[in-house]
Each structure stands twice: as C-alpha cells, then as structure tokens.
Amino acid sequence: MSDIGTDAGSAVNDAVNSAANASDGPFVRYVRKARPNMREASILQGEHWRIGILTESLIRFEWSDSGEFEDNLTQMVVNRDFGANPQFTVTHRDGLLIVDTPALYVTYDGKPFSKEGLSVVVKGVSDTQFNTWHYGDEPKHNLKGTARTLDEANGEIPLDDGVISRDGWAVLDDSAANVIVEAHEVDGKSNPLGAWVKPRAHKETDLYFFGYGRRYTEAVQDFYKLTGPTPLLPRFALGNWWSRYYRYTQDEYLQLMDRFKREGIPFTTSVIDMDWHRVDDVDPKYGSGWTGYSWNKQLFPDHEAFLRDLHERGLKTTLNVHPRDGVRAFEDDYAAVAKRVGIDPATEEAVEFDLTNPDFVSAYFDMHHRMEAEGVDFWWLDWQQGGVTRQPGLDPLWVLNHLHYLDSGRGATSSERNAGENCECEKCTEPGARDEHEMHIEQSKRNVSCAERNNRWSLTFSRYAGPGSHRYPVGFSGDTIVTWESLQFQPYFTATASNIGYGWWSHDIGGHMCGYRNEHLEARWYQLGTFSPINRLHSSNSQFMGKEPWNFSAEVRDSMVSSLRLRHMMLPYLYTMNYRAAFEGMPLVEPMYWAEPNNPQAYEVPDEFRFGTELLVAPIVSDNDDSAQLGSTEVWLPQGEWYDFFDGRRYVSAGKSGRRLEVWRAIDRMPVFAKAGGIVPLQQLGEGNKVNDLGNPESLQVLVFPGANGSFTLKEDDGSVASAASGSASAESCDGQTHVADTHMSFDWKNAGNATQFTISPVEGCAEAIPAQRSWEIVFRGVAQTDTQNVRIEIDGKACNTTEITYDQQTLSLSVVVRDVPSTACLNVTIANGLQIAENPVEQDSLDVLLHAQMPYISKEHAMQAIREQGVRSLGALRTFDTAPRFSKELFVTSGMPDSVISALEEILLRS
C-alpha cells in the first residue's frame, strides 16, 4: 500500500510540476513570442479568399472552401506582422480585384484560384519575359535553395526552390503545414510541454508570394522576418569539430585529443558517433543496436569522467542518436520511460518512438536531461527513416529538430530550481542567496555552478526539414562519399542554401565513406572546411580513412594543420559574422549574385562565394595539374581592387562587369581575396592547455588591406545566453544587463594630410566581457616597405614607444605590435606620408612557378629570361617555346611549355 501511495503521490507531484514547468517552458515561450496575425490594415478578404499584403513585395494568398482562415503560427511561419503598413492601392475593374504596390501588380477574379484568375506582375525586372506569375506556374529560373541530405550522393543532386529567382518571383506553399498552439491537454491527456503541433482545423490553399525582383538580400531578410531569425550560435560551434564513426575506447579518445593538443591542432567540439552506446551486445530479441541510450561500459567504463575530461580540455560534446526504435527493455532508462507511457516494465514491451504522444515526448526528454546532467552538451539527431508519423503530414525530422532545439536552451525548470541544495558556486554560498538562483539536478554529483546550468545555449545537429529549418541549427548534410565530385558540389550547395535562409550547414569535411584515397583531395577539402559555415571533420570506421593530419604526407599534413589552425584563429571574425547572421539576416556564406544581381558574370561562378563582409573565396575542387604542380580554379572578381588574403598580391578588376581569370595555388594555399579596405580580425593561437581556448582573446592580429577606407566592428560577448537575445552593445537583455562588447576599427587609407591611419576605438557595451588589456598586431598586408620612423603609435593620444615594427617581404606585410593596450583606450597607428601599395613581385613569383613545374629545363630558362626582359609582353613568346628543332637535332634540345604553366604565369603577369 505504501509503495502505491508513494507512486500516486509522485504522479500527482509530477503532474503539478509539469504544469508549472510548461507554463514558462521553452515550447510555450516559443508560441507566445510569435506574431502570427496579419495587420488588419493589410488584409483584403472575401467569403472564401483572403489576401494579406505583408510587405510591398510579399503577398499571402489564401483560399478556403469553408471560409475559415489560418491565424496560428505554422511549422514554417511564425510572424505575419512586419510592423509597418505597406503602401498599396486597391481598385475594382471588370470584375477583377487589382492590388498595386510599388513592387507588384496583382489581379484576382475572386473565384477559386486559377491560372486565368490570379496573377502577379513583378515590376523592375526588364530583362526577362517570365516576370509574370500565374497561379500554378512552375518557376523557370529559380536560384534554388537546399535539400534534406547529401546521403550517398556522389556529386550533384536536385535542390528545392529558394525565395529568389532571376525572374523576380518565388512561391512558398504552406498549405500542408501543421499549426503550433499552446495546449496543456492533448487528446484528454495532460501535456507537460504546454504547446503542441496539430493539423489545421480546416483545409485551405495558403501561399506566400515573394516578388522582390533582383533584390535578393531583401527577399531573404523578409523570409527571416516571416519564418523567424537564424539564432546566434555559441562560440564553440564555429571552431573545429572532430567526428568519426569509430569504436574508440575512453582512453583512446582522450589520448587522441591530447595528441592534437601536443601537435598544436585546436578543436572545440567532440562528436561521438553511435558507438558511445550499446550496439553489438544487444540481445537480438530486442532488435538491432542502431538505436540506443545506454553507455557502452566496455568502451566507456566511466562516461561521466570521460565527459568531464573533455570539458577540461576545452571541448564541448555531442552524442549521435538514431531515435527510430524508441526505448527498449535493455536500456538504463527503460523502466522510467515505460511507466510514463503506461507500460508495465515487467512485460519488456518496447516503448514506441511516437512524437505524437505527449507522455512519450516528456519521458524521452527526461531521459536526455539525465544524460545532459552528466555532461552531454547537445545532440546529433541522425534521423534517416523518412517522413511519417501517426499525425498526417507531420515530418518526424521536423518535430525532432523543433523540440530538441527549443529544449536544449530551456534553462533551469522550476523543479530544477529546487534541486540545488549542494551547489558550491560563490553566489549560492552567500547567506540568504540560495533561493535566488537556478540550480542543476544532481549538483552535488557534478559540482556544476548555478551560472553554468542557467546558461544553456540552444543547439542541435540534424538534417534539413524544409523552409524554416534555419531556426534549428546546426545542419548535418549526411554521409558524404569521398570523391572529387562530392567536393565539387559542396561550395555551390552551401552558398545556394542561403537562398532559403539556411546558413549553418555542416558537411563531412574530407568525406565520410567509400570513394578513394587522394591526398590532394583531402587537403583541398580541409581548405574548404576552413571557409565553411561549420568545420567538422568526419570519416568512417575504416582503418584507412582516418582524418588525422599525421596520416598524410608532409606537405599535405602541413596544409591540413594550417587550415585547422587558421579556422580557430578566425573565431573573432566568424563570431562577428555570427551576430550579423542572427541580427541582420545576412548568412556567413553568400552566392556572388547577391551583391551584383544584374551582372550576368555573377551567376557563372558556382564554386565561388562571399565569406562575410570582407572576403571572397574560390575553393579549388580539382586535382593538381601534373606539369604545373598547382591546383586551379576560375575566379570572377567584381569591379575594384582585391588582395590575396595570404600573401597580399594585388588584383585589379577595372571593368564594370568585373574580371574573369584562372588562378593557381600550391597545395598549401587556396584562393581567398580581401576587398580593398578590408579588415579581418584574428586571434593568436594559444599553446599547451590553451590550444582549444574559446575565451575572448587577449592577443589579436588584425589584417588590414590597402587601397580604400574601411571599417569593422568586432562583436564579442560574455558567453551568456542573454547575449543571444540582445545583439547590441547598447541594448539591455531580458535580465536588464548589457552582455555584448563592440570594438570598432576604422581604416583611413589616405586622410587629408595624405597619412594612413588605423584606429581601434574604446570598447562599447559590456567591457567586462573582454580582457582588460590586449596585445594587438596590426598587419597591413599588400603594402610597400616604409621607413619605421614614419610610423606613430598613440594610446589615448599619448605616444607609445614600446612597439615592434617589422616588414615581411614574402607577404608584403607591415606589422605593428602594441602590447598591453587597455580595452577602454583608443589605439591609433598613423603612417606619415601614407602607405603605398606594394608592387607585385612578378619575377619572384614566376621563378617559383617555373622552379616547381615538371617540364624541360631549357623551357624554364627561356621563359624566365623573357619575363625578366619583357614583363607582361613576354606572354606572346611563351607558346613559341613549345617547338622542336626544324633541322639538325644534334644542335638543339627539344623544348616545351605546358599550357597549365603558361596559364599560371599569365595570372602572375596580369594580376594588376
């Protein structure tokens, strides 16, 4: 009796706690934050139709036989109120409703939607005959979006549509989407989540017409307004991820992480594939071990210590899960989960994976919360089992992404706030302070402070589940085949995903399975990873497929290590672009045509993309040429001056349409260009135990590129989740505090006195978030050597003489190092008489190409002589060396100039 009474009492308490937690939980907050109702002033309506003018370019068309219309948020749409009344006029003529906005001309006959009765003309697109949309039209020149997965793809796959098109219009169909509502009961049962996804109460056609012409960025930004912004990622997500499908033991994995540290190779995230849980020792009566939630004690005898050891090494951890088979009787949590869904554990009946059952969902997350309390930071949701649930039209992948992402940032619940009696944090040891802070379950076991528990960043790792999936980063693109074809598709695939707002893809860098070994392929893939949204190395359990750099030849190993180190160095730049993506609606990776939509050349370079505000990237996705010993790619440079990011060589693109050229790089380098006036902040790498350091750095290197004025605002924060809600150094978050620190940098290429000046302004906002003092290395890349006497450094207007000034001839870089600068001070570096742009070292670069080229020596001599004597005019002579003697073969040596070598020399001779 007492056991039954205790169970009943626990059930009552659980129900009370569930209701209390649901009222302020993440799922309810998500619903309450939404603005799903359209503005009354922008609605036109008949008995069965409704038209919402959301903006002057974004129109919602609804037809409902029942006369009911949808005002709930849906799986895709969270906001239909854009905060302003768009400009439009309405007239009735010849039985037609005509809506005229500055961007669109809509005609509608008031009848069920038809090709003849509903059309929209997009204004301002004069060079296409397809700028008129009739209901039901298939898009002809949509610029595409992304796809669910690259699983088992060897190269190109079809992509879904995006919200932009060269014809000026795109349509998103939301008719089949489920709605999300606040619901404390589902089918008569208590719903611990407080919100639920359910089918629409009525059937209707529900379309969103994007008619932005060639205003591509505006279209994507309004897509974010409609569907919700991209969240701010935690800083660790932007570093290097180590992932491998491999049966590591606990000690083996930690030893590997320690070797990376000794080698000076930084990682921030450990991805533990499925062998963390029981797989091979599962009794066949339960099915396969593909799904599992119980640690494999043979491989990980003390998993809590393992997770703690990873954290001590500066690594966050995600575990792979395949949820398909639910929770079975061999699992550690089976009894608790079975009871929650009404199954007697003694029967060993499997608990079905059913996301339409609130009892299962609640128990499912309790199971995950227990493991998170042990040290798991987020989850890799490896769903591969299709799109069917018990609820028609509800994709289980979408539900997993939605629920897991919101749950991951839940903070402490009310029940957890009462579970922290043994918390050891400073605030909780203050007299009378304990009740004011949120606690972690099992604090005494892990000794985790209140601040850590309350600072849960939302993050999940899963496949794309349709428009709106950008709300649930990071995206897992699936198991990639190791081929050049796979690499060749990824730059286009990544950039094009931005057309549907999906900016945080994570690919299997280096490829996951099958394919073949090609060391240059791996090196080029690592380089692309450095300039990808997320850089996650991954491979299968084959003994031949390890991605550790020391498994490769010396030059490839060095290239790989350099790529991984550069990625970590770029964290200040990447984190700033992370803020830009979250608060300005501009993804890190952009197709080239976003900035130049009316330039046909911008559409002809699918492998090329912009990487944030300052850089242009053109990855090499084919093998090195045997003769030149270099890799190549075609590049389009928009009008202006550009500088090689690594060595400062100057490229001039004078024409309005830009410039196309073939560029060549050795295996240690990829084509990355900075704009004139570009500013790129990097952090200096730590050593030893600090190699994986994720704190706001004490030492920074800032690359500054000449030829134009420039500015950059470095975004940093105190690491708190509250910073993800504010986004501005001047804005207070929900807790009434400022968490963001802005450091503004400006570059005056030539001021009124012809001097060059670079200024780092005092920090604004949360100064406590960054080191009180910093060491700065300002590197002016691509400039001529100057007299160091012309360089003047001032801190708050006072001369600073404790500086180091050097010049590197290889990278054409003037370096100015200033140490221990207060972050609240203003640092000025002035070069009297101004810096000069460096002359490209044509002879030296040509000599380097010819030195390594596999070709006749006599041709090298002839080519080098011609270049020295004639410069750019030598191009006409280079092909004449590809001849054999006409007469006596005894007096001459056959010569030859491979086309690839000529092309590499052309790039050098014609750069500027």
Predicted regions mapped to residue ranges:
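Solvent-exposed beta-hairpin/edge-strand motifs
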Residues: 71-77, 635-649, 778-801
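Surface-exposed beta-strand/loop patches in extracellular or lumenal glycoproteins
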Residues: 59-67, 625-638, 765-786
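Short, well-ordered beta-strand segments enriched in hydrophobic/aromatic residues
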Residues: 51, 59-63, 99-106, 616-619, ...
